[in-house]
Structure formats: structure tokens, C-alpha cells
């Protein structure tokens, strides 16, 4: 059984920097657990780690998809499991860094997601619920899931229509509750390090980071994606991109678009915190207000590795 560290928490809390520090300390390699950093050419809006930040630390599952490709939790699990085994075979420590909670859960709970390939039945089910969502709204679709599987609906925000539809797909295809999907026996031993901080501190960091993204060229990056038909592409759904599309169409001002990015980022951070705080085995630290906690984290990992 491989030992794996996962650094979790909301956006802008310092996961990338900590993952690199720990990789240096424990001879580790980093696996991105972010659903948007897989896309090539989308660097600024995804807060992708830079080559300068990486230094000599190997990073995986970054820049592996074109913008028109669909990247799913099933595909992530398959690739991440492969990388974990490869890294462990090199006698290095796999370190997962990222904020996509369900992606991490596929690994920690070893979820049986099945094939990543679409079939016609899946597409038909998905398109049906998409049409229902467009006609009656996201809350109505969530209520249908709530009637069928209250446990699953309690874990999925009403606003996350994509995951709600995914749950309805699974129920329809398998005849089983989404919350009762089978788990395989755990193959890896995970240590979850959670990063958090006071909400005003976090929100201020998010707002400043969005401003810095704009300064660093987010507008140009998003415009390129828009010109590639980004509104209809999987990569175009990401925060930092879809909020700018109405601006490019001349429907809102740049200030309004930027404020929407900040708002969506703050809401996303809140959802991330809620998700990870429900993981009872996460060990929480606030290295933004208490930088010396990094030493405590290192000692904590040292003790865990010896077990």
C-alpha cells in the first residue's frame, strides 16, 4: 500500500507553495488534483504552477488536455492511480495538491466510477436532464435527485448542475443510488493536510489574486479561449473564463466581469471548505496566519511515514 499525501483546502490558501516545500523536504513528486489545470494554454486563470515555482520538483496531470477535450473524475482517477504507483516505484512520495473535492474522493474512497467513455444511453440521459435544467432550472433538477437519493443530494450543491446530472445518470444507468455506488478496497494510505484561514483573510487574497491575474494577462487568455468557441467547450466552464465571455460580447463592462470572477471564486472557496470539512480525517492548519505551522506539518508527516 502506497503512502500518499493530499493537500486540500480552498482556492488561494497556499496549497501549491506548500506542496513544493513538502516535495523538497520528503523527496516528493506533485500530482495536480485540479480539474482545470489539465488544459493546455490556460495558465493564468487556472493559477497553474509556473516552471519557476516547480523548480526541480516533478509535476503531473498538468497540460495533458486540449481545450475541446472533456476531462472527468473517472479519467482523473485512472491517471492519478497510475502516477501514484509510478512515483512510489521510484521511492518518491506522491503529493496531491488541488481543490477539486470529488476528484480527491475518487482516490481516498477508491470509488468505482467505471469507464470514462460515453455511450449513447449516457448521452441521452445527460441531454434529457440538461434540457430539463434549461427549462425548469437547476433547483428543480436538484429536487428530482433529492426525491431519488437524499443522501447524494445533501452532498451536492443545488448550483452544481453538472454533478447533479451526473448523479441522476448513474442512478438511471445502474438502478442503484448514487450514494451507494460501490467502493473498491483501499489500495493507498492517504494523509490529508487541510489548509484554511479566516474567511476575511481568504476573501481578500482571492480578490487580490484575481486583480493580479488581470494584470498578468487573463483578459488575453480568456479572449483566445472565447475565439476558439470557448462558450461551448469543456474548458470554457472554468471560473475566470466564462465570466468574461459576456464582456467580449459587449453585454457587460470589464469591471462587472472582474467582480463576477471574484464573486464566483469566493463562492467556490466556500463550497471547497464545506466539502473538505466534511472529511473527518483531514488535519487542519492555518499557515497564512501561523507560518510556523509548516514545521508542525513536517513533523506530523515524519511521524506518519514511520508508521
From Swiss-Prot:
Single Gene Ontology MF annotation: ATP binding
- What EC number is given for this enzyme? 2.5.1.75
Query: InterPro entries annotated for this entry?
Result: Dimethylallyltransferase, IPT, P-loop_NTPase
What is the required cofactor set for this protein?
Mg(2+)
- Reactions the enzyme catalyzes: adenosine(37) in tRNA + dimethylallyl diphosphate = N(6)-dimethylallyladenosine(37) in tRNA + diphosphate
The UniProt record lists the keyword Zinc: no
List ligand-binding residues for substrate: 11-16
At what residues does the UniProt record annotate the site feature described as Interaction with substrate tRNA?
A: 100, 126
Residue ranges of region Interaction with substrate tRNA? 34-37
Give the binding site residues for ATP: 9-16
Query: Pfam families from the xrefs?
Result: IPPT
Q: Which UniProt keywords apply?
A: ATP-binding, Magnesium, Nucleotide-binding, Transferase, tRNA processing
User: GO annotations under biological process?
Assistant: tRNA modification
- Give the protein's function: Catalyzes the transfer of a dimethylallyl group onto the adenine at position 37 in tRNAs that read codons beginning with uridine, leading to the formation of N6-(dimethylallyl)adenosine (i(6)A).
Q: How does it assemble?
A: Monomer.
The text of the family note is: Belongs to the IPP transferase family.
Name the chain's protein. tRNA dimethylallyltransferase
Amino acid at each position: 500500500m502506497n503512502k500518499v499525501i493530499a493537500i486540500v483546502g480552498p482556492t488561494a490558501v497556499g496549497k501549491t507553495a506548500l506542496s513544493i516545500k513538502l516535495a523538497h523536504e520528503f523527496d516528493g513528486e506533485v500530482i495536480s488534483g485540479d480539474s482545470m489545470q489539465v488544459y493546455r494554454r490556460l495558465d493564468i486563470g487556472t493559477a497553474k504552477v509556473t516552471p519557476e515555482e516547480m523548480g526541480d520538483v516533478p509535476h503531473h496531470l498538468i497540460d495533458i488536455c486540449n481545450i475541446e477535450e472533456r476531462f472527468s473524475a473517472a479519467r482523473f482517477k485512472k491517471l492519478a492511480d497510475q502516477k501514484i504507483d509510478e512515483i512510489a516505484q521510484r521511492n518518491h512520495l506522491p503529493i496531491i495538491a488541488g481543490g477539486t473535492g470529488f476528484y480527491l474522493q475518487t482516490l481516498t474512497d477508491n470509488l468505482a466510477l467505471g469507464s470514462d467513455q460515453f455511450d449513447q444511453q449516457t448521452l441521452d440521459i445527460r441531454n434529457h436532464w440538461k434540457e430539463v435544467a434549461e427549462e425548469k432550472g437547476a433547483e428543480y433538477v436538484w429536487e428530482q435527485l433529492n426525491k431519488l437519493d437524499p443522501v447524494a443530494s445533501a452532498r451536492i450543491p443545488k448550483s452544481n448542475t453538472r454533478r447533479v446530472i451526473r448523479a441522476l445518470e448513474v442512478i438511471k444507468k445502474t438502478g442503484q443510488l448514487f450514494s451507494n455506488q460501490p467502493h473498491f478496497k483501499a489500495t493507498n494510505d492517504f494523509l490529508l493536510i487541510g489548509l484554511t484561514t479566516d474567511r476575511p483573510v481568504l476573501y481578500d487574497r482571492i480578490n487580490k489574486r484575481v486583480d493580479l491575474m488581470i494584470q498578468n494577462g487573463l483578459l488575453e487568455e480568456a479572449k483566445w479561449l472565447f475565439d476558439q468557441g470557448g462558450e461551448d467547450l469543456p474548458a470554457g466552464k472554468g471560473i475566470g473564463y466564462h465570466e468574461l465571455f459576456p464582456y467580449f460580447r459587449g453585454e457587460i463592462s470589464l469591471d462587472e466581469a472582474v467582480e463576477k470572477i471574484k464573486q464566483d471564486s469566493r463562492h467556490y472557496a466556500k463550497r471547497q471548505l464545506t466539502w473538505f470539512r466534511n472529511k473527518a480525517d483531514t488535519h487542519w492548519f492555518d499557515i497564512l496566519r501561523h507560518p510556523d505551522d509548516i514545521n508542525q506539518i513536517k513533523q506530523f508527516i515524519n511521524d506518519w511515514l514511520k508508521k
